[in-house]
Regions:
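C-terminal accessory/tail domains of diverse enzymes
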Residues: 1-78, 91-272
Length: 272
């Protein structure tokens, strides 16, 4: 049953910001981060670190701006190895809501990859790694990692997760208790839902631009709220539509406010 009480102002989210040019050790030593923020290591980065936020709401976004300013002052930079991950609180999701989230994300995923680029940049997935760390739902279905049609037919969470992970149900408790599983390297990471209670969106490129991150967080929140609050799912787009201006349809489909719509226009994200 849809959860009509979820709002964009109250829904909690978190961000993970990957950067290079400042090592984990130096970041821990020199950065005066807001309370609850932490620095972690990431082996995929060159002389880099990952900055992880505590749970936030949109009213706390000034903390993100503060952290990005700190990083720039200390010489941080981003490369094709860097990304931004957005976690959204998974509270309130039942089986049908999770199905709708998968359907809605898949429907707009070609546009999500366009939006996921930093301003005037190529998405890191185009740099020879074929979205290695943020696989599209369509690719995961096509290569047999997950039976998408079977997911939509599942009548219980156990059956849904069997098909999401591609394992028998007796293996699920072991998988749920582990932070790491290969399926976390998908653009929509639902392993995070089982491990820490969040839905993770891994599509986004590295950036030190707060406006990029604000737009991406808004997109993720709107996808989650659409899936929680409305039984009707988004209609999939045809390949040719990814080359047209989709902003009107995106705004209508996700319920973007006029201010949110301007947010995407202002940063020259690729709509055509």
């Amino acid at each position: 049953m849809p959860n009509g009480n979820a709002t964009i102002e109250s829904r909690r989210f978190g961000v993970e910001i990957e950067v290079e040019g400042i090592s984990t050790e130096r970041a821990r030593r020199e950065l005066r981060l807001p309370a609850g923020w932490k620095v972690t290591s990431d082996g995929s980065l060159y002389d880099g670190s990952e900055i992880v936020s505590p749970p936030l709401t949109l009213g706390d976004f000034g903390q993100v701006e503060q952290v990005l300013s700190l990083l720039k002052r200390h010489g941080a930079r981003v490369s094709e190895r860097c990304s931004v991950h957005v976690h959204v609180d998974g509270n309130g999701f039942d089986l049908e809501g999770i199905k709708r989230l998968v359907q809605n994300t898949r429907a707009y995923e070609p546009w999500v990859y366009q939006i996921a680029r930093g301003a005037d940049a190529e998405h890191r997935g185009r740099n020879g790694n074929h979205y290695r760390y943020c696989k599209p739902i369509e690719e995961v279905h096509r290569n047999g990692e997950t039976d998408y049609d079977g997911l939509m037919k599942a009548r219980s969470f156990k059956r849904f997760w069997e098909r999401w992970y591609g394992v028998p149900r007796q293996e699920l408790p072991r998988i749920f208790s582990s932070k790491y599983h290969p399926c976390r390297y998908r653009g929509l990471n639902l392993h995070s839902f089982n491990y820490r209670g969040t839905v993770e969106f891994r599509y986004f490129d590295g950036t030190l631009n707060p406006a990029d991150i604000r737009a991406w967080v808004t997109l993720c929140l709107r996808l989650v709220l659409k899936s929680l609050n409305e039984a009707r799912v988004l209609r999939g787009i045809k390949p040719m539509e990814t080359r047209r201006n989709p902003l009107y349809r995106l705004a209508q489909g996700l319920g973007l406010t006029a201010e949110e719509r301007r947010m995407f226009q202002h940063h020259k994200l690729v709509w055509k």
